[in-house]
UniProtKB/Swiss-Prot annotation:
This is Uncharacterized gene 45 protein. The lineage of its organism: Viruses, Duplodnaviria, Heunggongvirae, Peploviricota, Herviviricetes. Signal peptide: none annotated. Residues 50-59, 179-189 have a biased composition (Basic and acidic residues). Residues 1-59, 71-289 are annotated as: Disordered. The gene is 45.
Amino acid sequence: MSMFLKKQKKTKGGSSEEKRRGRTGSPPRMTSDPGAPRLKRATYFQFPKDGIKETMRKTKDAGDLDDVFFEDCTQCNPPSHVPVFSKPKPRTRAGGAADDSDSESSEDGGEDDEETLHSQDTPPGGSSSDSDDDDQKLPFTATGGIKMPGYMSRISDSSSSSSSSSDSESSSSSDSESDGDRSTPEPDILRQVTSSLARGVSPPRAKPPPAKGEVPVISLLSSEESDSEGEPSPLRAAAAAASQKRKHTSSSSDNDPKHTKVIYISSGESEDEGEGAGAGEGEPLGPEDQVLVVMSQESCEHYMATTPPVAGNPPYNWPWL
């Protein structure tokens, strides 16, 4: 074992005493750990401050990142293709004397482009009559918005027509928004059903009132289906007459005045005449009430054809619900 240690010492070149004295070229160890590296000096990473300063200076001179270095656009002049939105300046008078505010605002560099645009088309001594011609020549308004040629005229025409139509609607006392949206008169069959429900009149073959959890069914059947079902009740006879009238004289129904009465279909109404009279006449539908309206294909097509497509899905915009 001692021979092995001596051989190792010889291979390393000298004894430990010579190493401690520093006679060899290798520096002494900083720690007692034999695997530790030999440190000549502390090599810390130095951040290249000079290189970064040079890069920032070059970027500022190039003007690519002006929005980063100048966040408030008051220290830099924007390029000509960038639109500048500012308050409209008062026009210079015929004598050439401008307001004090105009002279103060002309100091800002961001508003020079708009002044040049105004000065290209209008002389500095323009009067109030020349301002209309100036507005027609320029494609944008004084506040910076883009003009559309026939936009305001279309708005004024539509507003005048809508105001006249709203006046006519207000003269006829309309109590519900759904009736205001409907442009066709109320169908006869619906009038018959709602009037019979409001009076509490029930057909002779009256079914028992629905249970607590059931949904009441209001049947609006056409003439063909009512004839095929057997003996017609007064309500079905009225429905058949209304459908026949709608078939033959559909053009005359358009000339009738618009009926603007409120339609209430209450789920709490009972089929008995005694209870039906006091079943909340004129009572609106609550959120917990449900009404199922059963219609034939002909009636459905008629209602869908005469109902204007208001906002939403047209098949679900029932005008009476």
